[in-house]
Structure formats: C-alpha cells, structure tokens
C-alpha cells in the first residue's frame, strides 16, 4: 500500500505570487459570540487552510462590528444601570445584560433613544469620555473573543472593525459635495439613486452622525 505524506497532501503551487483576503468571523463588539459567528469562523478558517496549501498568501481579516448607535445605547445603559465593578467581573455578559435593559426601558421612555444618539454623535466628534468608554467595552470584548479563537486554534492577521473608517467619512462627504451629489432629505443627507431605480444611499443621519464607508480606503 502506498504511503501518503499527510504534510504535503493536497498541496499545490497555483497560488504562488497571489494574495487572497478572507473576511470572516466578525462578531459584534459587546455582544456574545453566537453560533452564527462560529459558523463563519470555521468556514473562513477552512478556506484559509485550503488557499495556503495551494501556495496563496492569505490575509485573514476579522472585521468587527465595533461602531454605531448601539454603542450610544450601551453607554447610556452603563451610566444608568451599570457599574465598573460588575463589568470587570462579568465582562460581555454584563454588557449584554444592561444592553437588554436599555431596550426594555426605551419601550417605555423614548427619550433614552435620543440620549443614545447624542452619545454616538459625541463618539464621532471625538469626545474623550465617550471614546474611552467605547474602547473599554471593545477591549473587554476582544479578551473574550480571543479566548474563543485560542480554543479553536486560530488567529487573524487583522482585527479591523467599522471604527477604522470613522475618521474617513468627512472626506467622503466633501467629495460628494464637490460633485453636487449630496442631497438633503428630511433632515438627513443622501445620494439619490432614483435613476437606477434604487433606494437612496444614506450618508449623514439627521442627528449629524454618519454611517461608516470604506470607499476611499478600498479605492
């Protein structure tokens, strides 16, 4: 019987000199790692191994959900019902607890949503307190995520989240204004896509906050 060298089994050279970028796992910061994240993590890591075996240089990217109005909600929740001691002791579980509490209370008091939007605007404007709390939540989450990745025996080359683009939106807005593409609609700023029979592209919300955009970075 012929012996198969398992170390080289399935290896190839068709990928030499080529690069493949794989974006996978991508959990939402301050929320528990669930089965959906596990599925994409396993699939992504399997693709990484296959491409690597074929000679490709593979960049493993974990694009975290680490920016958005939900962090304004979490900051409000932390200030109203949380404590530093509880978060440090219970980590993501405590963050999830107060986040759920926020939504329960917001059903009875809509002003909480206004406060959340205000805190997110502060984050976008570089407010030191807002960003410090957000970074703390993110760091706590990464400790838990990396623990899980270690159990699975995998790593990433880049932990690049939505927040990576937070200082790049202003340039996108300026370029759209220069080209007269930015239109005000119900207090928000959009790019109309009517000629393509598509819904408008939201650029700036009416509260002054933005959506993240990687257009300039990828181009």
Report residues per predicted region.
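NTP-dependent nucleotidyl-transfer catalytic core
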Residues: 1-219
């Amino acid at each position: 019987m012929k012996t198969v060298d398992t170390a080289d089994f399935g290896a190839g050279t068709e990928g030499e000199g080529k690069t493949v970028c794989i974006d996978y796992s991508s959990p939402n910061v301050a929320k528990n790692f669930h089965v959906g994240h596990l599925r994409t993590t396993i699939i992504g890591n399997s693709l990484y191994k296959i491409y690597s075996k074929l000679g490709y240089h593979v960049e493993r990217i974990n694009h975290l959900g680490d920016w958005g109005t939900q962090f304004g909600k979490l900051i409000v929740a932390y200030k109203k019902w949380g404590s530093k001691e509880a978060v440090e002791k219970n980590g993501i579980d405590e963050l999830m607890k107060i986040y759920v509490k926020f939504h329960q209370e917001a059903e009875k008091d809509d002003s909480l949503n206004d406060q959340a939007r205000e805190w997110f605007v502060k984050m976008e404007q570089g407010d030191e307190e807002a960003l410090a709390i957000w970074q703390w939540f993110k760091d706590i989450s990464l400790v838990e995520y990396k623990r899980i990745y270690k159990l699975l025996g995998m790593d990433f080359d880049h932990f690049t989240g939505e927040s990576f683009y937070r200082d790049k939106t202003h340039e996108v807005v300026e370029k759209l204004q220069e080209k007269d593409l930015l239109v005000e609609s119900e207090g928000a700023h959009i790019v109309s896509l009517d000629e393509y029979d598509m819904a408008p592209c939201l650029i700036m919300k009416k509260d002054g906050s933005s959506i993240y955009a990687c257009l300039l970075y990828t181009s």
